[in-house]
Amino acid sequence: MITNNWTYHGEPFVEPGEYYGFVYCITNLLSGKRYIGKKFFWSVKRKQVNKVRKRYKVESDWKEYWSSSEDLKEDVRTIGPKHFKREILHLCKNKGTTNYLEAKEQFLREVLESNDWYNSWIQVKVHRSHYKP
């Protein structure tokens, strides 16, 4: 689809640096409908080499990612990615903080209470020790 059009504080965002993940808002510029979600920059893969299991970090598909919402992805396919704005709201240094801030944004914006949002679910399980702002 599109290589990368994520913005952070109004500027193009291209390199994750030391960050683990981000919380984002995607806006349909024609209808105004939005989606709040999260995405991790990295994942850990395992590979067996000479009977030894090794772990290594690989970059995710975050540059091309359009959310887990099937309705949103269908709209992107139908009207095209140029009619959407992809904004990074929070850059996070660990998984727990990413999960917490996604849920916080979803509750603060009341995404389940209006049809102005693509969001259909809020799922989170975060322990206090995992949240490190």
Predicted regions and their residues:
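Structure-specific nucleic-acid interaction/processing domains
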Residues: 1-133
